[in-house]
Amino acid sequence: MQAIFQALNFNPWTFLFQTLNLLVVMGLLYVFLYKPLGKVLADREARIEGNLNDAAAAREKAENILAEYRQQLQGARQEAQAILDRATKMAEETRAEIINRAREEAERTLAQARREIEGEKSKALAAIRSEAASLAILAAGKVLERSLTPDDQERLAREAIAEVERLQ
């Protein structure tokens, strides 16, 4: 075995010092590099995890707000439709009321016109009767001026009756 060690130029003291150097370097690397690097990675992982949780919470909150806004929008649409329906109903009622008032006013005007026509007709008939009576008196006066025969009297009576019937 010694022959192998001599062929390889193996020195146990060098090997021991190199092993100790390796262990010291590994210890120093562990203390100064691996632990801080592990801590940085753990902190980064925790920060990323927190950010993901915050993002999930923010997304859930945004979805809740969106759902609430959609519900409010639906409510606003329903309210707008209800207002539109009420306005349409009120417009129809107002239209019907205006039409009824116009119809009633037209009926009152027509009735007033009919009453005025009847009054004028009555006045005209009274005037005609008065005129007919005057004419009858005038005719009677003229007839009396001359002597009447029974045929003339009968003819005058028939004419007066016909005139009165015609005037009525």
Curated annotation (Swiss-Prot):
InterPro entries: ATP_synth_B-like_membr_sf (IPR028987), ATP_synth_b/b'su_bac/chlpt (IPR002146), ATP_synth_F0_bsu_bac (IPR005864), ATP_synthase_B_chain (IPR050059). One of its GO terms (cellular component) is plasma membrane. The keyword Aminoacyl-tRNA synthetase does not apply. It comes from the Bacteria. One of its GO terms (molecular function) is proton-transporting ATP synthase activity, rotational mechanism. Keywords: ATP synthesis, Cell membrane, CF(0), Hydrogen ion transport, Ion transport, Membrane, Transmembrane, Transmembrane helix, Transport. F(1)F(0) ATP synthase produces ATP from ADP in the presence of a proton or sodium gradient. F-type ATPases consist of two structural domains, F(1) containing the extramembraneous catalytic core and F(0) containing the membrane proton channel, linked together by a central stalk and a peripheral stalk. During catalysis, ATP synthesis in the catalytic domain of F(1) is coupled via a rotary mechanism of the central stalk subunits to proton translocation. Component of the F(0) channel, it forms part of the peripheral stalk, linking F(1) to F(0). HAMAP family: ATP_synth_b_bprime. This is ATP synthase subunit b. The lineage of its organism: Bacteria, Bacillati, Bacillota, Clostridia, Moorellales.
